[in-house]
C-alpha cells in the first residue's frame, strides 16, 4: 500500500551537471573579430613581406630612373655625335665640290642637312658644330638647327637657331656661360660671319668681351626703337624672340636693318619649363678667297684665330 512516500531504492538518479557553454557558431572564443587571438608571428611575417616588397619596388624604380638618365645623357649624346659627324662630312664634301647648301645659291636647303658651321670661342677650340636646317626632333638630334622661315647667316633680320641643352649632343649646354661681347662665329661656304653677344658697354663691331660694365641684362637699341636684350628667359610658346627684330612683331623682314643671331635652348637644365634666349648682332664679315669652280679657301683666317686668344676665360 502506498502512503505517498518513495522508497530509497526507487529514487531516480541525480541529473548530470550542465555542460559548459560551447563556442559561438563560426569560431572559438577569445579576442579578435571571430573570437580568435591573432597569431603575432603571422602578423610579423606579413609586415616583413610588405616592407621587403616595397623595398624591392623602390630599388627597381631607382634602377629604371638611373637607366633613363644614362640613356638621355650618354646614349643619346653618342647617337647625336655620330649623326653630327655624318652631317658635317656631307657638308664638307658638298663644299669641296663647289656645291652650295644655302638657298642664296639658288638651291633649297633641305631639312636635316647641314647648311653652315658654328664656333663659339668662349667654349674652346674643340667647340664646333654643323648647323642643320630645321628644328624638329629628328633635326635637333643631329645638331643645332636653323628655324625655318628665319633669315640666313649675314642677312638682315634674325638668323635663329635651336639646340638641346642636356643630352642629344647638348650643343647649347653652356649657353648660360656666354658673356656680353662674346663672339659667335658662323661659317658658310663663302663667308665667315662674326656675331657679337649683345651687352651694354660692348663694341659690337669689335666683339670685345672684356669691355668694362658689359652686361647681358642690358639691351641693344634697334633702329625700330625695340630694346633687344643679350639674354632673356621666356615661355616655350613665345615665338616672338625669333622675329626679324626679336620681340617686335610690328617690323616685317623687309624693313629689318640689323643682322641678328638668336640661339634658343631649354631652361633650366634637365627641364623644358622655360627657354633661354641669347641674342647677338653681326659685328664682322670675312669673305673667303675664291678658288674657282665654285670652291673657296677653307683656311681659318687670322682674325678668327685671334678670337680664341682674345677671349677672357
Indicate where each model-derived feature is located.
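Solvent-exposed, non-transmembrane regions of membrane-associated and secreted proteins
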Residues: 46, 52-53, 58-313
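Terminal targeting segments of Actinobacterial cell-envelope proteins
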Residues: 1-51
Amino acid at each position: 500500500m502506498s502512503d505517498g512516500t518513495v522508497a530509497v531504492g526507487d529514487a531516480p538518479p541525480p541529473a548530470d551537471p550542465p555542460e559548459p557553454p560551447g563556442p559561438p557558431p563560426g569560431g572559438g572564443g577569445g579576442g579578435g573579430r571571430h573570437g580568435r587571438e591573432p597569431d603575432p608571428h603571422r602578423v610579423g611575417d606579413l609586415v616583413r613581406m610588405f616592407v621587403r616588397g616595397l623595398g624591392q619596388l623602390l630599388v627597381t624604380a631607382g634602377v629604371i630612373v638611373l637607366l633613363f638618365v644614362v640613356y638621355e645623357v650618354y646614349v643619346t649624346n653618342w647617337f647625336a655625335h655620330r649623326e653630327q659627324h655624318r652631317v658635317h662630312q656631307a657638308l664638307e664634301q658638298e663644299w669641296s665640290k663647289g656645291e652650295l647648301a644655302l638657298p642664296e645659291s639658288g638651291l633649297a636647303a633641305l631639312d636635316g642637312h647641314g647648311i653652315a658651321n658654328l664656333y663659339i670661342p668662349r667654349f674652346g677650340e674643340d667647340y664646333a658644330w654643323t648647323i642643320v636646317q630645321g628644328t624638329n626632333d629628328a633635326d635637333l638630334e643631329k645638331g643645332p638647327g636653323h628655324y625655318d622661315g628665319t633669315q640666313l647667316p649675314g642677312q638682315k633680320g634674325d638668323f635663329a637657331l635651336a639646340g638641346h641643352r642636356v643630352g642629344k649632343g647638348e650643343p647649347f649646354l653652356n649657353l648660360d656661360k656666354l658673356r656680353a661681347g662674346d663672339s659667335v662665329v658662323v661659317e658658310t661656304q663663302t663667308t665667315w660671319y662674326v656675331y657679337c653677344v649683345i651687352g651694354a658697354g660692348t663694341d659690337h663691331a669689335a666683339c670685345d668681351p672684356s669691355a668694362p660694365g658689359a652686361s647681358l641684362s642690358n639691351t641693344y637699341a634697334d633702329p625700330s626703337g625695340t630694346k633687344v636684350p643679350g639674354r632673356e628667359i621666356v615661355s616655350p610658346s613665345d615665338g616672338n624672340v625669333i622675329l626679324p627684330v626679336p620681340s617686335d612683331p610690328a617690323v616685317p623682314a623687309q624693313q629689318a636693318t640689323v643682322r641678328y643671331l638668336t640661339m634658343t635652348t631649354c631652361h633650366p637644365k634637365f627641364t623644358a619649363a622655360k627657354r633661354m634666349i641669347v641674342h647677338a648682332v653681326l659685328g664682322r664679315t670675312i669673305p673667303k678667297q675664291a678658288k674657282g669652280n665654285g670652291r673657296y679657301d677653307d683656311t681659318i683666317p687670322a682674325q678668327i684665330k685671334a678670337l680664341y686668344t682674345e677671349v677672357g676665360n
